[in-house]
Amino acid sequence: MPVTHIISSIAPLECEGDVLSVNDLHFSYPDGHVALNGVSLKLCEGDKVALVGPNGAGKSTLMLHLNGILGGKGEVEIAGKKLTRENLPAIRAMVGLVFQNPDDQLFSPTVFEDVAFGPLHMGLPEEEVRMR
């Protein structure tokens, strides 16, 4: 059964140059689980936001859409740039991401894994990262 939460019944204030805009975002996992069902939101510069909810509510799934790790139906726009395959590197350069399991990035077993974490996750081949 889907969970629906009303975040605010107050109409959002207009702002110049939205920092983040999500419009009618939908995403289902391969097993059929609907994680996002028509999510829309707009954040302006300086907004402070908390995204809370129970396990499985779609919080992490939404975050993974904000820098193109997952793709669904709908539109995501970051600082005026639509999230498309063509401008994905530019979007990822503006959006930081910390994974849920801090052991995946904070405590690397080797110096190479620590230093290479960013370049590898931005799509550089391991051979090129090792040469640099």
Kindly label every feature range from the protein language model.
Residues 9-22, 26-38, 50, 85-87, ...:
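A short, flexible loop at the N-terminus of ABC-type nucleotide-binding domains that lies
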Residues 57:
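ATP-binding Walker
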Residues 60-61:
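Conserved Walker
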Residues 67:
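Helix-to-loop junction immediately C-terminal to a conserved catalytic motif
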Residues 72-84, 91:
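Conserved ABC transporter NBD signature motif
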Residues 103, 109-120, 130:
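Short helical segment in ABC ATPase nucleotide-binding domains corresponding to the A-loop/adjacent helical element
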